[in-house]
Amino acid sequence: MVKSLAISLIALIIMKNLNVSIIGLSVLTILSMGAASVATGGVELNGLYSTDFVMGLMITLTLFVAILSYLSSAKVSRKASFNLMVISISLILVMSFSVSSFFLFFFFFESVLAPLLLLIVGWGYQPERLQAGGYMVIYTVFGSLFFLWGVSELYLSGMSSSMSSVGSLVKKSAMSLWWLYILGFLIKLPMYPFHLWLPKAHVEAPVAGSMLLAGVVLKLGGYGLLRFMLVMQVSLSSVFFVLLLSVNLAGGFYAGLACVRQVDLKCLVAYSSVAHMSLVLLGVLSNTLLGVMGAIIIMVGHGLCSSGLFSYVNAIYKMSHSRLLVMNKGGXLFCPVLVLMCFLLSSSNMAAPPSLNLFGEILVFGVGGXXSXAFLFILGLMSFISACFSLYLYGSCSHGKGLMHSESLNLSSLCDVFVLLSHWVPLNFLFMFMP
C-alpha cells in the first residue's frame, strides 16, 4: 500500500494538469481511508515500512489537506512548478509517516523543508519571505541534529533503529539526555518558546503552504515524538519532566493571550496553532493510553481546523486585499456565507461539540488533571482563552463597519465555501467513527 501510494504520487508530479492531480489525490485519499480503517494493528514490512491506524490516519490527512490546498490555489501562477512543489511535499510527508526506521524518518523529516522552502520563496507575497524561510530552516535543522545524535547514541548503545524497538535494552546513561533528543520535535510542533519561526513562515507563505504547514507538517513533530517516546523509558516524576510540562502549558496559555492582541489574521491563526499543539505535547509526554489517544485526536482535529481557517483568511484576502482585522470588518454584510463558515470553524477551534477537538481535549484534560491539580487549572485557563480568541476572530470579521469596498460573492468565493465546508464536515462528524 505504501509503495503504491509513493509511486502514484511520483506519477502525479510528472503531470502538469492541475485537475488531473486533484482527481488523483482524491482517489489516493479514498484508498488511504480504507487502509486506515483496516490497519488497526501494527505491521512492519521489510524492516523499512510500517502500517498501523495512526499511520493511515496521518496519510489520509496529508492527502486530504493537499487536495483542499489545490482547490484554494486555483488562480496560482506557474501551475506546473506549483504542482511539483505540493505533490513533492505530499510524497515526502507520506513517506515520513510510513517508515519504521528512525534514520529514514529523520531523512524525510528534514527533506520536507526543501519543497516547503521553495513554495514559500517562490509563491510568497512579500520580500520578507526570504527571512521567514531562513528562520524556518535554521530552527528546524538545528533542533533535528540533536534528534539524529540521540538516535545514533541509542543505536550504538544496543537499540535498533526500528520504531518498534524496546528501550529497556539500552543503557540508562544513553537515556539521560532524552530531553535534548526530542528538541527537534519540540521545534517542529512548535512548543513555546521555540515557535518564533512559525508566524513568520505562515505570514509569508501562500495559502497552500500555510494549509500544508499547519495541517500536516506540524503533525510531523507530534508523530515523531509519539514514536520516539514509545521506546524511551522516561520517569514521569522526574523534576525535568515536570518542568518541561509546566513550561509547555504556560507557553500554550501565553500563546493564547498573544492571539487576542493580534491585528493580522494569519498571525492570529498561527499563534492559535502554538496554543493547541501544547495540548498535543502534554498528551504525548504523558505516555498513557488516554493521553496518546487525545493527542492523536487533537492532531487530526487541529489539522482540519487550522487548514480551514487559513483557507478562510485567503478567501477574505482575495476580496479585501488585506489581512488586517480592522480592514475586514462587516463581513456579514457583503458575504454572509463566508462568515457562517468562519463561525463554524471558530466554534470547532474552541472545541465546541461535536468537533474532534472537544473529545481530544477531554482526554488530555483528564490526563493533566490526574498528573497535577495545577496542570488542570492551567488547562482550564487555556480552554477559556481559546474560546476568547476564537470569538475574537469571528466577531472582528463579521461585525462592524467595513473600511474597504469588497468584491461581491463570485464563482471563486463559491469554491472557497466548498473548501471550508470540506474542512468542517469531517471535523464535526468523524467522532462517529472513533474506535
Swiss-Prot record:
Q: Is the keyword Calcium assigned to this protein?
A: no
Q: What is this enzyme's EC?
A: 7.1.1.2
* Topology term for the membrane: Multi-pass membrane protein
The UniProt keywords, alphabetically, are: Electron transport, Membrane, Mitochondrion, NAD, Respiratory chain, Translocase, Transmembrane, Transmembrane helix, Transport, Ubiquinone
Single biological process term from Gene Ontology? ATP synthesis coupled electron transport
Question: TM segments?
Answer: 27-47, 53-73, 80-100, 102-122, 132-152, 177-197, 206-226, 239-259, 267-285, 295-317, 324-344, 372-394, 414-434
Gene Ontology cellular component terms for the protein in this record = mitochondrial membrane
Q: Record keywords: Amino-acid biosynthesis included?
A: no
What is the protein's name according to its record?
A: NADH-ubiquinone oxidoreductase chain 4
Species whose genome carries this gene: Mytilus edulis
Q: What is the lineage of its organism?
A: Eukaryota, Metazoa, Spiralia, Lophotrochozoa, Mollusca
Q: Which gene encodes it?
A: ND4
